[in-house]
From Swiss-Prot:
Gene: Avh6
Signal peptide as annotated in the record: 1-25
Designated name of the protein: RxLR effector protein Avh6
Predominant localisation class: secreted
Other noteworthy facts: Avh6 is present in P.sojae strains that are avirulent on Rps1d hosts, whereas the gene is deleted from the genome of virulent strains.
Disruption phenotype: Leads to the gain of virulence via impairing effector-triggered immunity (ETI) allowed by host resistance (R) protein Rps1d.
RxLR-dEER (motif): residue ranges: 48-70
Organism this protein belongs to: Phytophthora sojae
Primary role: Effector that suppresses plant defense responses during the early stages of pathogen infection. Suppresses cell death induced by effectors and PAMPs in plant hosts. Triggers a hypersensitive response (HR) in the presence of Rps1d. Suppresses BAX-induced cell death and enhanced P.capsici infection in Nicotiana benthamiana. Also suppresses effector-triggered immunity induction by associating with Avr1b and Rps1b, suggesting a role in suppressing plant immunity.
Domain comment in the entry: The RxLR-dEER motif acts to carry the protein into the host cell cytoplasm through binding to cell surface phosphatidylinositol-3-phosphate.
Length: 125
């Protein structure tokens, strides 16, 4: 046998032997990773209460500010659209009244012109 053929056979045998050893090392590492658990998951503390407040009775309640923000009733874009579009303004005034917003309560949240218009709308309807 030639020297190059012998070298090739030896290198192939070494490569196969080292490949098997590496793959067994990977298998043992994977089983150890699965054994580690977070203490929060085991204790049942994995719930997150985003934008809400957890109360003693177990129900999450949003504050009035969060409810308004979610509905978009007093968002800057909404107020801008109301100033430019009378039909949209009337629809929003109807929603405000349906949600129980009194003119005096929202006076600081809206522009003066919308406050005056809402005050009239609230009295008429």
């Amino acid at each position: 046998m030639r020297l190059s053929s012998t070298t090739f056979v030896v290198l192939a045998a070494v490569l196969l032997a080292s490949g098997t050893a590496v793959s067994k090392a990977d298998e043992t590492g994977v089983t150890n990773v699965n054994a580690v658990h977070s203490p929060n998951v085991l204790a049942g503390v994995d719930k997150r209460f985003l934008r809400s407040h957890h109360t003693e009775d177990g129900k999450a309640k949003l504050s009035n500010y969060d409810n308004e923000e979610r509905n978009g009733l007093f968002a800057a874009g909404t107020l801008s659209d109301m100033a430019n579009d009378m039909i949209f303004r009337f629809k929003m005034f109807t929603k405000w009244k349906a949600n129980g917003h009194l003119p005096k309560a929202i006076k600081k949240d809206i522009p003066r012109s919308l406050y005056k218009a809402y005050k009239i709308h609230h009295r008429m309807n």
